[in-house]
Design a protein with these regions (language model features):
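Substrate-binding pocket helix/loop in short-chain dehydrogenase/reductase
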Residues: 101-114, 210, 214
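Alpha-helical segment proximal to the catalytic Tyr-Lys
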Residues: 130, 174-175, 242
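C-terminal substrate-recognition "lid" of short-chain dehydrogenase/reductases
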Residues: 222-251, 256
Length: 257
């Protein structure tokens, strides 16, 4: 299916590895021009160079910066538009933050978990909406988690912030819909990639236990891949999903009940 992303400008926060990188590659494969951002300059530049070889340097723009910071986000989106033209799509993929199990979570860790997961998504969405709504066109995608769809025993800050992201998606969709700007969300399940949590689980001392758990809990009996999230993301961002907004889409191999 041709998704109609040729020449569209997509901004992806958290793009140097894993899910974010999978989304970038899917959008590039559909002909989009993609701005990629992440905090780690070295990893970001390595991926920019690799992707430029495959898709052309003229369709990539990279900026290392903290996508939790309002001014950094605003400046990055402004520079993206100066480089490529009007923003069509924005992907908020900044997430995770270390949090101990249980309820003994100090205020600093609690606040940091929400800043990392929820606030980063809100601030990028706001920056994108400021540009998209006057033009009457655009598509925003938040990357949440199935941890936000139910109590799965994840760290309190993570699951709670992701649940708030799911709600944010629906509220922003109602606000922006009359301006022809769509806001959707993907809730990934157990996605495996180099350096990620599930790679550590699948290769660590409890790898056999985790393998049994996956077979028991996931009807497709396996982990997902960044490419599979990328495929769903490219569709949701694209004009082909023109009647989808406010949707929280699990991509989890059937794990959520």
């Amino acid at each position: 299916m041709h998704l109609g992303l040729d020449g569209k400008v997509i901004f992806v926060a958290g793009a140097s590895r894993g899910i974010g990188l999978g989304i970038v590659e899917a959008c590039l494969a559909e002909g989009a021009k993609v701005a990629i951002t992440a905090r780690g300059a070295e990893a970001l530049e390595a991926e920019r160079a690799r992707l430029a070889e495959a898709y052309g340097a003229d369709r990539l723009w990279a900026l290392a910066g903290d996508m939790r910071d309002t001014q950094v986000i605003e400046d990055a989106v402004t520079r993206c538009e100066a480089e490529f033209g009007p923003l069509f799509g924005a992907v908020a993929n900044v997430g995770l933050y270390p949090c101990p199990p249980g309820f003994e979570v100090d205020d600093e860790t609690w606040d940091a978990g929400f800043t990392q997961n929820l606030d980063s998504a809100w601030r990028l969405s706001r920056a994108a909406l400021r540009r998209m709504t006057p033009r009457g066109d655009g598509s925003i995608l938040l990357i949440s988690s199935i941890a936000g769809l139910g109590a799965l025993g994840t760290a309190l800050t993570y699951g709670t912030a992701k649940a708030a992201m799911n709600h944010l998606t629906k509220e922003l969709a109602r606000i922006a819909g009359s301006k022809n700007v769509r806001v959707n969300c993907i809730a990934p399940g157990n996605i495996i990639f180099p350096g990620g949590t599930w790679e550590a689980n699948s290769t660590g001392p409890r790898a056999d236990n985790w393998a049994r758990w996956i077979r028991r809990e996931v009807p497709l009996n396996r982990y997902g891949s960044p490419e599979e999230i990328g495929a769903a993301a490219a569709f949701l961002l694209s004009p082909k999903a023109s009647f989808m907004t406010g949707a929280v889409v699990p991509v989890d191999g059937g794990q959520t009940r």
